[in-house]
Amino acid sequence: MDQSFGNLGAGAGSSSGGSNSKAAATAVSSSSFLQLPLSTASPAYYGAPLALLHHAAAAPSSSQQHQQQQHHHHYARHGAEMSAAEAEAIKAKIVAHPQYSALLAAYLDCQKVGAPPDVLERLTAMAAKLDASAAGRHEPRDPELDQFMEAYCNMLVKYREELTRPIDEAMEFLKRVEAQLDCISGGGGSSSARLSLADGKSEGVGSSEDDMDPNGRENDPPEIDPRAEDKELKYQLLKKYSGYLSSLRQEFSKKKKKGKLPKEARQKLLHWWELHYKWPYPSETEKIALAESTGLDQKQINNWFINQRKRHWKPSEDMPFVMMEGFHPQNAAALYMDGPFMRDGMYRLGS
């Protein structure tokens, strides 16, 4: 059932109310109480009388009663089966229910969300009257009506929460922005002073006798530099974050040159170099271990050893015999690709 609170019960199936249920459904079409979605489990029998709750909440006058009579005539013209007496009886049964005041209070709470102050005051006064008139309501137990009243009270409470959530989120956002602005400006004093200066002319601050020249003419207010606010904001930002900016500047000035390895990694590579100076060609397994210990990748390690051998290592003349000691086949590829004898050793010896 996709209806509004003003159309409660319209188009619903038959219920335990019998003929009253069909009559209640026809009394809904031209009345409106709340434009709210309904639960499909709500009974149809008590749907139509809720279209009259809005009138009961505001103490109906004779003109309102006359308007209700016009509604009944309108229903009769369209073949409605509910008489005015039946509608009043069902309405009286709902009004006499102990939860009737809670239902109207929940409805008024929905109306209060985002309402202007004057409307909020009137709604609060109306809610106070409802609380005063709530005492003394007694009605025989009617499980169907009890279920209906409880369901719609809960629905209105949830609807009010949905209405309030975006407003609360907006207020929280504004508070955060205000706190950030106060933090940037070093407090609310300077911003308040700027606002007072900007609004001073419109509030008549410059119309006192102190602002009059000897000829009786009003002195013009001093000109305000439009960039003064930006300068003040810049000053406040520098004052607050100068230490952080200086540390960043020092960090950038100490930034390593491109391609230079970290000191700790170079020390570990040099340590391995000293231990294997006679044959400084690490195997693939040793390269993986060095990469894990230094935090470098394979390419960095390969480049470091190539450059290190070019600059600081020269094989001796008897190297072809010495290097066979502890030599294993996987180093042959590295020996060939690196070409130590062609580039560093034998080439220079033969040149």
UniProtKB/Swiss-Prot annotation:
Record-stated family: Belongs to the TALE/KNOX homeobox family.
PROSITE patterns according to UniProt: ELK (PS51213), HOMEOBOX_1 (PS00027), HOMEOBOX_2 (PS50071)
Region spans: Disordered: 1-23, 57-82, 187-229
Ranges for domain ELK: 232-252
Localisation: Nucleus
Pfam families (UniProt xref): ELK, Homeobox_KN, KNOX1, KNOX2
Keyword DNA-binding: yes
Keyword annotations from UniProtKB, A to Z: Developmental protein, DNA-binding, Homeobox, Nucleus
DNA-binding stretch(es), residue numbering of this chain: 253-316
UniProt protein name: Homeobox protein rough sheath 1
Basic and acidic residues: bias regions: 214-229
UniProt feature, compositional bias: Low complexity: 57-68
